Amino acid sequence: MKKLLAFFTLCLALTTAYAHPQDGMSPEVLIHYFIKAFNDENIPALEEVYAFPHVKIINGKLTRFDTKETPVYDFVGLKKTGWKYTKINQIKVLAEGANSALVELNFSRINNDNKDYFQGVAYYVLTKDMGYWQILCLSTMGVVPGVK
């Protein structure tokens, strides 16, 4: 009986070890989770939110990120703009299928004086290739502080 209990405990531990925070999240909830990880400057969580490879199209310039070795965001540069945190104004799921989704995020950058110093819209193409939602592509129509 003790061996059986130990076996089930081991199985549970292994199952939990391979779980991802975004398991069971909807596309909208993933974007909320992403912004929280961004505001916390939680690089490991941000690396889990993004699929690799992924692309960013910022102001018409395409950048491909093949591995986690390339920083996903420039927090040093972002803080130089006075950034304190990013606020979600609105999230719209524009399209959602079984394994892909398109999400529009209207957001603001808030500075140390708690003032909105930048407002923008970003579009996220999400994939569920690994069984949970991840960002495959980020696109903005203009330059966004802190986004490479």
Which residue ranges define each predicted feature?
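Short, low-complexity N-terminal intrinsically disordered segments enriched in polar/charged residues
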Residues: L4, F8-E48
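Hydrophobic pocket/interface hotspot
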Residues: F34, L46-E47, H54, V103, ...
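Sec-exported extracytoplasmic/periplasmic mature domains
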Residues: I35-D40, A51, V55, V76-K80
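A mature extracytoplasmic/lumenal domain signature
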Residues: Y50, G60-K61, L105-R109, A122, ...
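A short gly/proline-enriched turn/hairpin at secondary-structure junctions
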Residues: V55-F65, T81
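Surface-exposed, charged secondary-structure patches
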Residues: V72-D113
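Beta-sandwich strand segments
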Residues: K115-Y117
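Short beta-strand edge/turn micro-motifs at domain boundaries
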Residues: Q119-K148
